[in-house]
A protein has these predicted regions:
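ATP/NTP phosphate-donor binding region
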Residues: 1-80
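Long, hydrophobic/aromatic-enriched structural stretches that serve as scaffold segments
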Residues: 76-101
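Short, acidic/small-residue loops that bind anionic groups at enzyme active sites
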Residues: 102-128, 134-142
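Oxyanion-binding "anion nests"
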Residues: 214-254
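C-terminal active-site/capping subdomain that shapes the small-molecule cofactor and substrate pocket
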Residues: 254-361
Length: 361
């Protein structure tokens, strides 16, 4: 993998830009947006400000992808902005790509700073990767950091360790519960969502300890929009990497996971990587509790198709971990692109061996 520029650490008192690069949720649900702003400011001692168009209506955001790109450049160029967080994901960030020139990528590269996002923001992470800077796969402002009842403590501690400290991140913790139910951003009351017990990460294949630099994102976005574009990483960027993947809330089935895995195999990516990590599959479209239980019962089926595809492509030796705390369920740990990660199949341990950020010069 190519070497990435590492952004400076955050400090209390810093200003963070909240940006809308896909769906205009912040303009549609201002109370949810403000809840996320308040919880981030209270938990980390930073100031959150919107980019110029971040609070526009969904219709205006959709009609003006150039506004979104302008906001992204504004945030990277502004020396007072020390970090950028996406308000939410969506489905059309890819429309910004047609507007981007070499100058836009140079702006990102010449102004490295923390960039946070999830889901459709995978496209923006690939923009940062192409520009040559580290970005951070994380919760968004309105999903995760705006969680009802406060940001989960495991996320607060992980965010501080990853973005505010310059010592190695170390072993990734795991939560004994997770949240998957739909949250109505527009509801007048925002009660705590129910938690589901979990045993934590599942080490479903592999017998050794491996290391590799992190690369990945939302599988739906990677395999249905990014692949084949100029954002798709070069083959050598997957060499000896640890690939992290996660499914969106659109509830793609295990069959889709099998198709996507076969695509990775056909590209030769599965043969290049040192390890593979998956979050819990997301889904916020339950019709009732029985539907939710049926969905949770599919988790082992995802494991089965992952192993099936790996066997088809001769990688039944590859260390694989599923059921991890990132992606479209809460809590969501931060995964820094390009950071050296270690998977130990014997000790059932995942660690990031270096710091997420660097000291300010």
């Amino acid at each position: 993998m190519k070497e990435l520029i590492i952004p400076n650490a955050l400090k209390r008192g810093d200003t963070i830009a909240a940006i809308t690069l896909s769906f205009g949720s912040a303009g549609l649900f201002p109370h949810r947006y403000q809840q996320g702003v308040h919880q981030i400011e209270e938990s980390f001692g930073v100031k959150v400000i919107p980019t110029p168009h971040a609070l526009c209506s969904p219709a205006d955001i959709y009609e003006h992808p150039e506004w979104r790109l302008d906001d992204m450049m504004w945030a990277f160029k502004n020396p007072d902005i020390k970090g950028i967080i996406c308000n939410i994901g969506g489905s059309d960030t890819i429309r910004l790509l047609d507007l981007m020139t070499d100058e836009h990528f140079e702006t990102i590269r010449n102004n490295p700073k923390i960039f946070l996002g999830i889901s459709d923001s995978t496209i923006n992470h690939l923009m940062c990767f192409k520009a040559g800077i580290r970005s951070y796969y994380s919760a968004s402002l309105m999903f995760g950091y705006a969680e009802n009842g406060g940001i989960p403590d495991i996320m607060v501690q992980n965010t501080k360790k990853t973005l505010f400290e310059t010592t190695p991140i170390g072993e990734l913790p795991h939560s004994d519960t997770f949240i998957i139910d739909f949250v109505d951003f527009g509801a007048s009351e925002q009660p705590k969502r129910p938690r589901i017990l979990t045993d934590g990460p599942r080490f479903i294949q592999g017998t050794k300890t491996v290391q590799g630099r992190l690369i990945g994102g939302c599988t739906d976005v990677l395999m249905m929009m990014a692949v084949g574009t100029k954002l798709w990483p070069a083959p050598h960027d997957f060499d000896n990497a640890i690939l992290f993947l996660e499914n969106s809330e659109e509830r793609p089935s295990p069959d889709y996971m099998l198709y996507w895995m076969r695509n990775l195999g056909a590209q030769g990516i599965l043969k290049r990587i040192n390890g593979l990590m998956f979050s819990r599959p997301g889904n916020d479209k339950f019709t009732d509790d029985a539907d939710k239980q049926n969905w949770l019962a599919t988790y082992p089926k995802f494991d089965e198709v992952i192993l099936k595809a790996l066997k088809e492509y001769g990688r039944d030796d590859l260390p694989v971990v599923t059921n991890m705390d990132y992606g479209h369920t809460v809590p969501q740990l931060i995964l820094p692109y390009g950071a050296m990660c270690e998977i130990s199949c014997t000790s059932k341990r995942i660690a990031i061996l270096e710091s997420g950020v660097k000291e300010r010069e």
